[in-house]
Regions:
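Residues that mark the junctions of alpha-helical repeat units in TPR/alpha-solenoid scaffolds
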Residues: 34, 54, 67, 74, ...
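Short coil/turn linking the two alpha-helices of tandem helical-hairpin repeats
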Residues: 109, 124, 151, 193, ...
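Short coil/turn linkers that connect adjacent helices within long alpha-helical scaffolds
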Residues: 28-29, 67-70, 107-111, 149-153, ...
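Conserved alpha-helical positions within TPR/SEL1-like repeat arrays
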Residues: 36-47, 73-87, 114-129, 156-171, ...
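Alpha-helical segment of the N-proximal tetratricopeptide repeat
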Residues: 31-68, 83, 87
């Protein structure tokens, strides 16, 4: 027996597994971050359009999740950062956290999970927003295969996938495939509470697709039909008048203005402003 004193735990315990609890009392247990509290506070920042505050909030909790070895928490925050940087136009940061999120899926062996599908969609949407459409389509196809083969995939996830994937196909000039997915998105979101907002966005995307395929003059009747339907959906009584509604109003307003629906565009901007001022 050595006279150097008792063995220390690190001298006889196996290395910790970062994805599971250690049966021998891990020296560095996982400290989960409060996921719902993080999301609730993020909603508060976004309802006030406090993008700087939202960024600080997310980066703080990402660091906490990293220090606490909470891989699930890191994945959640990375997904939110992808969306944040996409909305604020930060290409480099959006791609950085997209790739970090994808690597976390590999680390956790989550690539066949619904969480993976959500991450693929978020990353693909960011790549699409900054013109990397082939990379986006690759990720959307992964998500589509996963969602459609998984029983009980939530309708809002499928609807969001179909709409955003169609937008990429439209950009690539693959119009028949794009319209097929837009129609799937419309049908799917009919079953989602508050899904009228996503349906309105899809209608406007379809109007742009018609204009791109046929030209504004030839496609005018169909374009106006889609714009009228989008206006109806945005003002449907089931639409939630919250921070997200304000964001959607701001997002849709320029499209209405582009096609000459100036009164509708101004009304949407006014509604968004009123919601933000009340927040």
């Amino acid at each position: 027996m050595s006279n150097q004193g008792p063995l220390r735990p690190e001298e006889y315990l196996e290395p910790d597994c970062p994805l599971c609890g250690n049966p021998y009392e891990s020296l560095h247990p996982v400290r989960p971050v409060p996921q719902q509290r993080i999301l609730n506070k993020l909603d508060d920042y976004m309802s006030r359009r406090d993008y700087d505050g939202a960024e600080r909030h997310l980066l703080y909790w990402l660091k906490e999740a990293e220090q606490g070895r909470d891989l699930r928490g890191q994945l959640l925050v990375c997904n939110e950062l992808i969306g944040h940087y996409r909305k604020t136009g930060s290409r480099e940061n959006a791609f950085r956290y997209a790739e970090l999120a994808l690597s976390l899926l590999e680390d956790m062996d989550f690539e066949g999970s619904i969480s993976a599908g959500t991450t693929y969609v978020n990353a693909a949407t960011a790549y699409s927003a900054f013109g990397e459409n082939q990379r986006a389509l690759e990720l959307f196809e992964r998500a589509k295969a996963l969602y459609e083969s998984t029983p009980h995939t939530q309708a809002h996830l499928l609807g969001g996938l179909y709409n955003n994937m169609a937008l990429v196909l439209q950009t690539l000039g693959r119009f028949p495939e794009a319209f097929e997915l837009y129609n799937k998105a419309m049908k799917t979101m009919e079953t989602v509470p508050g899904g009228v907002l996503e349906q309105a966005i899809t209608c406007l995307n379809m109007a742009d697709a018609v204009a791109a395929q046929l030209g504004q003059e030839e496609g005018e009747a169909r374009i106006f039909e889609l714009l009228d339907r989008a206006d109806e959906l945005l003002h449907d009584k089931s639409a939630p008048h919250n921070g997200y509604y304000a964001f959607v109003c701001e997002k849709c307003s320029p499209t209405f203005s582009y096609y000459g629906y100036f009164a509708v565009a101004e009304e949407l901007q006014r509604e968004a402003k009123e919601i933000y001022e009340r927040a």
